Design a protein with these regions (language model features):
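Single conserved hydrophobic/aromatic residue that forms the stacking wall/gate
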Residues: 1-7, 11
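Short, amphipathic, aromatic/basic-enriched membrane-interface segments that mark the entry/exit
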Residues: 5, 58, 81-90, 134-140
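Transmembrane helix exit motif
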Residues: 8, 67-79, 118-141
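Small-residue-rich hydrophobic segments that form or flank transmembrane alpha-helices
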Residues: 12-21, 25-86, 93, 150, ...
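Hydrophobic alpha-helical transmembrane segments of multi-pass integral membrane proteins
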Residues: 19, 146-159
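Alpha-helical transmembrane segments of integral membrane proteins
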Residues: 59, 89, 112-119, 144, ...
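Small-residue-mediated transmembrane helix hinge/kink sites in multi-pass secondary transporters
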Residues: 76, 101-106
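Selective transmembrane alpha-helices of multi-pass membrane proteins
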Residues: 94-99, 110-130, 219-223
């Protein structure tokens, strides 16, 4: 029975990975929107310490996005749908924002983070439902504005455990990029969010004694 239960868990995680990958490719989001709530439920069932469950779920989700993000970004690169001129300064800002977001998130109580994630999911639903549109006129922001935008995107993404597409796609659309380029460039932005967010959660959880075995900081490796 234990073996069949373990096999079932593996299949569930594989299905979750496929779904996250599809979301990353189609909408430029990293799949964390689905992964975080599922991991929270999984960690509760495993009996992990309540004080670290949400943080562990977010950190683990961010680390999973590294693989889906790389795959998605590579697919968009092959289709020439990444605007590298806009990507570079935003990605630079993301590095600092994602690190800061990880360190900030672990200082916040899990309940507040859960409420924040729930509100965020509602906002995403509204955004999709009403198909909020932005400027179609091409804008060329200065680098400092792009770096600032990247730091905000990186910060919020690391706090919520997502690939950032919900923030970066509308941002790139507001600059007048086509929807295809906005999604492709956003998918590329998911890679530095995931890498530096993961790095932040690893460092932030280095000396936390309540984390379960097989954790690397706030990353639960078996997931």
């Amino acid at each position: 029975h234990t073996r069949s239960s373990a096999a079932s868990d593996v299949y569930k995680r594989q299905a979750l990975g496929v779904l996250a990958g599809l979301l990353a490719g189609m909408f430029g989001i990293g799949g964390g929107l689905i992964i975080v709530p599922v991991l929270i439920g999984t960690f509760i069932n495993l009996g992990f310490d309540e004080s670290i469950i949400v943080h562990l779920a977010i950190g683990t989700a961010i680390s999973c996005i590294i693989f889906t993000g790389l795959s998605s970004a590579n697919a968009h690169r092959k289709k020439n749908s990444i605007d590298f001129d806009n990507f570079r300064p935003v990605a630079f800002g993301i590095i600092f924002g994602a690190l800061a977001g990880a360190f900030f998130a672990v200082q916040i109580k899990g309940l507040f983070l859960k409420i924040s994630i729930a509100i965020f999911i509602m906002i995403v639903g509204i955004q999709i439902l009403f198909d909020l549109s932005f400027s179609s006129k091409r804008i060329h922001p200065n680098k400092n504005k792009s770096i600032f935008a990247g730091s905000v995107i990186g910060f919020l993404s690391a706090v919520l455990g997502i690939g950032g597409g919900t923030f970066s796609v509308p941002y790139f659309k507001s600059l007048g990029l086509s929807l295809t380029s906005s999604i492709g460039t956003s998918a590329a932005c998911g890679v530095p969010i995931a890498i530096f967010g993961t790095f932040g959660y690893i460092i932030a959880g280095t000396n936390v004694m309540t984390l379960p075995e097989m954790s690397l900081g706030y990353i639960y490796l078996p997931a």
